[in-house]
């Protein structure tokens, strides 16, 4: 045996192969406290399956997708401006898991997911996000945008728009699914959305939208929800309206906007975020004029909690990795978890991790009561 091979025996294992549900006793206790027994009997086997995927196939796919980020192809071979985005097959397989097998985008909007006769309560959605993110972080942004976009559409869109778009937005068949994106940010309008400059002008039964959106995640989604200012609207956030912009027009042609480039990001590398220029893009008003900020704020609580869940999930993954090393790394004749200073460091990780878990479990539970 070579010296290099012998040295490898000293390296502690990582979380590969771990079931993130099975090892999380805090999560299991919270589920028992907040979910009724009949619902637990339905969802816990699925949570266990996702937990196993999180430390297995999903983790493998995530690593591959991060090494092979999406690629923008501005034109086709004939010179047509199509701005197609090429995703690695690993990303497409993760989409199949999230949208297809686990229906994470729609479980709170349709009956029958996993055989449960009602739409799932919000807490179930957040638990699935928590387990999924421990294996893959980037894709949960598009999944969450689809979920909150469905909430907005169901509450605010006209019956005509609902009939046209909701069936495919609610699908879990990847050949039928229309994914959702939300284009809000501009160069001068990040947190201060009142600075939005993208303009919309009425044209018959639709609107034509012009301007630049600066940070557009899930840039090649089939359905886009965006904020724009109509002609003559007041300045600031009170003059913003919400529009649905389809990727393709009714005649099958591409809508009039361009994905100018993709962002070179430090994180969420698997998911395509881009800069978009709208040049007379066809859009449809959602709700009443000048109520866009009110509409989007109604989904902000969902998004905020989702971001908290993602943070809790990453904290848990980091804790799992630390525990795995501490329990298996041997120094001075014993596993380093036996050393008091190591235990102290682990406790400094463990306490806020359990607090984050407890926070989102409680908040997700009372969200159903608030609704």
Protein language model regions, located:
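Extended, charge-enriched "interface" segments that sit outside catalytic cores
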Residues: 1-117
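Internal helix-loop-helix
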Residues: 83-176, 217-219, 357
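A short core secondary-structure module
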Residues: 206, 210-254
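Extended amphipathic alpha-helical segments enriched in small hydrophobics
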Residues: 304-370
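A glycine-rich, basic-preceded beta-loop-alpha segment at the flavin cofactor/substrate interface
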Residues: 117, 251-256, 260, 272-303, ...
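N-terminal leader/propeptide and maturation segments of large enzyme subunits in energy/redox metabolism
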Residues: 35-58, 117, 123, 140-163, ...
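Internal maturation/activation junctions in enzymes
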Residues: 157-198, 202-205, 361-371
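Short Gly/Pro-enriched turn/cap motifs at secondary-structure boundaries
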Residues: 188-191, 215-217, 234, 265-271
